[in-house]
């Protein structure tokens, strides 16, 4: 019952926040005007600038910002206990994350769809524009390298997810043509597409799991370079190139719209399963996981400040400012839709993060299992206790996925930690959510095999929408940097997209911690702090926008301070901690990147301090229209 109560209270909190704080921001602070000219109308080109109904743009925006962030982050953070993670998700999303996304969207809408980095040049100063865009470029390169790897790993771990994810692409193209070329109604094709997606999940689970390990794995120079992860990464980047250069209505919008329906249905099933499991007493949060963990292993970073960079999406994420000001602002057809899209989508993501926390604690406590078999003949066998030969549940089940101070004896009689923070890799945390969510779905009578397929497709679909949106965003950033540096070839959308993906592929396909194709994991430790630093810098732009328009700034200024201090603190700990710091463990590449990111932050803050004195009430006019139009 405690699991259900926490879920219900969290969801009620989000609903109340939307209709109170969100509405106050929309009316009193940003003054949204349904009659105002928006970029999608003023710069309409049917490629990037496309006026779009709010239901469709909400689907694109939500699925793009969600990705695997609100899954992996909370799945890791419950290591410190479910209560700190829950508080940061609920309070962070209401007062920081949703304000950040909403503010970035409005600022971009009022500046002809320019990115937050471009707007920084006018609100703070020309150097601030270049600094912000450079941080965006670094962050998006890491996102592309990591998310390509994430999807490839999911396809590798869960072959049953592959068919449904790829079936979605031709469905999206058909729906895009139906809506934008023929003006057809969107309801019926959406329902049909949703049905086909779930049929494909069943086919993938029971008949046709697509496992490329049966095909690829060619050894070259003593290493298996053409492994499953490498092949899927290459295929995904080719897809991203095509999706990024096509008009948004052709593939990006309809795919995200289909995704949003599929994902919302999956989330509703999870909530129903959670409710049934909670009411029947099978899902017991407090019996499964500690509210605040007391047996933290020595290799774990401190909860303060690392909680704030571990859970990004689901509370606040700098990547969201790129989506708000990169793709969404170019498609919103009325200012009055901005609260629904910007503030509302972030609260829904917070709801997803709450479900993840409960799935990784109470859901895992319902039982854990191992995958046995290959091809379509695989099954899931429960892990049993050695003494009683009965399936482990509650805390005994939870510690199989979140081992903390499990010890082993060395040859000399001393002990060492087995598990701990080092064991919390990407696979383990994705599996924790998939397994816990599968248990919730099983409470509804859905077979575990089908439930796991639904959960795996959920994760892969979120990550895929983020990947293709991030590719388009990186193209915008490269375009703006190229304009600033007068590099004309990179202002071409095909060349800019190819440059973005070749660079990301070069990182992703390197020999990394998990072998060929895991190079993105090398830069993974940078992502958390760099991503959250972007949120702090985006808040700085929002603050200056409001300051120059003589608006109250406290509601954005306080989050700005938090999101500038916490990521910097975490980054410095990662760089200089005597036991684990990059400087002292020989991770000089990470240390070098850390120095660059911290230097950029300090420089950006200095630019803000310089501009502050003359900013209030001094709002700069927009540049001539032709200088803003994209290639």
Language model regions located:
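A generic transmembrane alpha-helix motif of multi-pass inner-membrane proteins
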Residues: 1-17, 194-247, 253, 258-259, ...
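Transmembrane helix-loop junctions in multi-pass membrane proteins
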Residues: 2, 22, 71, 83, ...
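Extracellular loop-to-transmembrane helix junctions
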Residues: 2-19, 77-108, 117, 160-172, ...
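Membrane-interface "cap" regions at the ends of multi-pass membrane proteins
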Residues: 17-71, 260, 306, 630
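Flexible loop linkers connecting adjacent transmembrane helices
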Residues: 23-50, 76, 86, 90, ...
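Membrane-interface helix-loop-helix modules in multi-pass membrane proteins
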Residues: 52-111, 122-126, 142-157, 342-367, ...
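Loop-to-transmembrane helix boundary motifs in multi-pass membrane proteins
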Residues: 123-141, 344-354, 427-429, 447-455, ...
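Extracellular/periplasmic helix-exit of transmembrane alpha-helices
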Residues: 275-295, 347-434, 469, 509-518
